[in-house]
Amino acid sequence: MAEATERLYRVEYAKSGRASCKKCSESIPKDSLRMAIMVQSPMFDGKVPHWYHFSCFWKVGHSIRQPDTEVDGFSELRWDDQQKVKKTAEAGGVAGKGQHGGGGKAEKTLGDFAAEYAKSNRSTCKGCMEKIEKGQMRLSKKMLDPEKPQLGMIDRWYHPTCFVKNRDELGFRPEYSASQLKGFSLLSAEDKEALKKQLPAVKSEGKRKCDEVDGIDEVAKKKSKKGKDKESSKLEKALKAQNELVWNIKDELKKACSTNDLKELLIFNQQQVPSGESAILDRVADGMAFGALLPCKECSGQLVFKSDAYYCTGDVTAWTKCMVKTQNPSRKEWVTPKEFREISYLKKLKIKKQDRLFPPESSAPAPPAPPVSITSAPTAVNSSAPADKPLSNMKILTLGKLSQNKDEAKAMIEKLGGKLTGSANKASLCISTKKEVEKMSKKMEEVKAANVRVVCEDFLQDVSASAKSLQELLSAHSLSSWGAEVKVEPGEVVVPKGKSAAPSKKSKGAVKEEGVNKSEKRMKLTLKGGAAVDPDSGLEHSAHVLEKGGKVFSATLGLVDIVKGTNSYYKLQLLESDKESRYWIFRSWGRVGTVIGSNKLEQMPSKEDAVEHFMKLYEEKTGNAWHSKNFTKYPKKFYPLEIDYGQDEEAVKKLAVKPGTKSKLPKPVQELVGMIFDVESMKKALVEYEIDLQKMPLGKLSRRQIQAAYSILSEVQQAVSQGSSESQILDLSNRFYTLIPHDFGMKKPPLLNNTDSVQAKVEMLDNLLDIEVAYSLLRGGSDDSSKDPIDVNYEKLKTDIKVVDRDSEEAEVIRKYVKNTHATTHNAYDLEVIDIFKIEREGESQRYKPFRQLHNRRLLWHGSRTTNFAGILSQGLRIAPPEAPVTGYMFGKGIYFADMVSKSANYCHTSQGDPIGLILLGEVALGNMYELKHASHISKLPKGKHSVKGLGKTAPDPSASITLDGVEVPLGTGIPSGVNDTCLLYNEYIVYDIAQVNLKYLLKLKFNFKTSLW
């Protein structure tokens, strides 16, 4: 359904007497006015209300400026209660004595702002992150503690100057003054005067005087204002009358009709029956007062009144809710069935047909509430940190011998806002040396186990001086292959106000996300039979997943709703004891990539009962029978993910171990194979793409699922280019994220609504396909324990790999090609050739044979991530699958090459912490080239053309090219090509037939990043 703006607060009449107040712990009587703050549930992917008695709500310091826009359910209250909420909010929640001036009215004390002298030196200013000394004046804003919302609103302290700087963000309005602060009267006379000057009430006199100067008729203005006030008063009276009419109908219906009667009335008038007595009563009263609602024109769903409009509760597709919202829905006359006319109230009820009125939209609507949560958030980018304190709320561990001593390092870290820690488990970041990482001491093993990123010492210097983002600096100085995320300790949750409320693109919700360390631990699944037993069941060592009739009773389900902001999972397993006839149903649920969620283990009386219960739960969650061959997606129901928990996981572990002494392969080849099949690198690549390793661990990627995701991206590309509706874009985005689980923490999954996002996801799927190939190779094939794991993996590549002698002529030619064709604009690194391998893929030479006679054959570069090379060597360079959208590639789906080494090297995706990359040299049969200067989505080459050449402004000097065995090697230095009206800096070569490529060499390169990247 269309979702109303998410609001931080809620108000209603208690539906029962079961809820207890979060402040006084007393029960809240049924039908009494109660208020709540909405917080993220720790048990499931959604928000829950924390209820208070009306009076208790204000006592804990909740502050509301505009109840009509900030409080959900406000307009559904009785008129008198609406006024009660408004008046209490206007009084700042807590009415204070105030200060009297010149016989004027007493000022209202603001309940959520306070001033006092610090009672100790333990508090920290939330503006500058410096300590507030004991006895120093401090100001506070009450906010919800993200870790302990049950405590209600607590003080977040600031130095007075820091408070003044953040006045707008903290919601201290222009009309407020220092004298309205709680505790102001207890300050010294001197501090009162100083504070009054710092926090004056800003009056809007200037504009009036300016208007007079401009000759604006003040009399006319006053008349206009009077007219507006009269109009406003008239609307208010009408709203009051409307409210009283609706509540009169509700009161009379409660006396005269049973809940079943009300349901019958809704059914007779072709309205959906909601759950809950109060919701049923609301719908009937709305229909009687304004007419029966006609179905939504977009999806034929039911429209429902919610505060500021009628929202559709239907679904556009099985994946996406309808977005229709209107204040003028189509209606028909409400009809009372004959049998109900015996009820005296319904018999005499006559209501004049009218439209529902809505209060005018506020000129300064409340901003959407920030995510309020039970726990804190580790974030990849410390966006909330002050510019001069980039390491705010971060704990840093130092390891090994640094150029600075420990005290100097500590001083520098604290100056940047961080804190020193001695524990790997508590650390956000580790500062060490490359030597220490290679040594892999016991302490470094702890750092790796905790998945804490390691950076070099230069990071501290650059983070204080560079304008680059923290994330870029972390990547540039990284020394470890692990550590996908940098944790930041929780800061405050600020409810932004005014223009400054626009959320930062890099901001993340204040919820503790499940770090990769946690994910890694949960990935240690115990495999028995056909699937992995979830360790959260506590039965991984004593039970296995039941397999019956060739079907494994284990399911992982996903559900994404971008509008609502949910990114949910549901896991279901039927477990059978290893030793006796005992059975359990285990299920777990929550939000992907976070600790939010829970689980349940139920012991079943028998195998039959367990199977029946499993199938019932599966059908309840998906709408499909367990044994159904063709799955149908239903609205609001989960979708099954093809997670392949194969029995060959142990084989992967065996083959992924470090090589022994059995291998007969040359040492450089051994190292190359180890690099290509490095499982940690594969995991890191997935994490970079925000793939959720817990829901979709390595090796669980189904090729069919990836291809289905490509198809969705093709539809997205089409929808974007055709300017399709928001509903269609939403639908496709929901489907994509359900199919490929992403870890967004508490952020809403982003809409796939532009070509850039499509391109990024296409690149992600390209890499996933290659990782899937690599992992499939690791799992399959020989299990010969007499062979070294490296040799076993080498055989799976089906490629003859020979080390080229460093002193040979061909090695000299290749090194010259590397040196001469490094582009001047690619100056962040230099390339050093470590090893050169001559490669011959099985069957490729035979496949290439027909093209050996084609003219214009060149030796060209092709770079790719290390994780893609198992797929490249075992299957060759491939063209994107037909399901992939064309827009992901500049010149359509083909195999891309370059004549400038650094152009291809950029696709190796190396970093300062991971500087080794692999690059290919392939003989490419280009023939007649179709020359282009701008992007063109080629699906078929023009007649007589064999390839595409994207013309660049710079190209290797053609006079320096050499020819080896009829193949041109363009190893000249880069010179202007004479082509200026092109969008490319350097040449690109694309072939659309895989047989036109014969891979010749593989180079292992070291990227020597320059110390200053800016």
Curated annotation (Swiss-Prot):
There is a cross-link at residues 192, 203, 250, 468, 487, 512, 528, 748 (Glycyl lysine isopeptide (Lys-Gly) (interchain with G-Cter in SUMO2)). The keyword Ribosomal protein does not apply. There is a cross-link at residues 203, 487, 748 (Glycyl lysine isopeptide (Lys-Gly) (interchain with G-Cter in SUMO1)). The modification Phosphoserine is found at residues 41, 177, 179, 185, 275, 278, 782, 786. GO terms for molecular function: chromatin binding; damaged DNA binding; DNA binding; enzyme activator activity; enzyme binding; histone deacetylase binding; identical protein binding; NAD binding. The gene is Parp1. InterPro entries: ARTD/PARP, BRCT_dom, BRCT_dom_sf, PADR1_C_dom_sf, PARP, PARP1-like_PADR1_N, PARP1-like_PADR1_Zn_ribbon, Poly(ADP-ribose)pol_cat_dom. Zn(2+) 2 binds at residues 125, 128, 159, 162. This is Poly [ADP-ribose] polymerase 1. Residues 374-524 are annotated as: Automodification domain. One of its GO terms (biological process) is cellular response to nerve growth factor stimulus. Residues 542-638 form the WGR domain. GO terms for cellular component: chromatin; cytoplasm; cytosol; mitochondrion; nuclear body; nuclear envelope; nuclear replication fork; nucleolus. NAD(+) binds at residues 862-864, 871, 878, 904. The modification N6-(ADP-ribosyl)lysine is found at residue 521. It is found in: Chromosome; Nucleus; Nucleus, Nucleolus; Cytoplasm, Cytosol. Poly-ADP-ribosylated on serine, glutamate and aspartate residues by autocatalysis. Auto-ADP-ribosylation on serine takes place following interaction with HPF1. Auto poly-ADP-ribosylation on serine residues promotes its dissociation from chromatin. Poly-ADP-ribosylated by PARP2; poly-ADP-ribosylation mediates the recruitment of CHD1L to DNA damage sites. Mono-ADP-ribosylated at Lys-521 by SIRT6 in response to oxidative stress, promoting recruitment to double-strand breaks (DSBs) sites. Zn(2+) 1 binds at residues 21, 24, 53, 56. It comes from Rattus norvegicus. The modification ADP-ribosylserine is found at residues 500, 504, 507, 519. The modification N-acetylalanine is found at residue 2. Residues 386-477 form the BRCT domain.
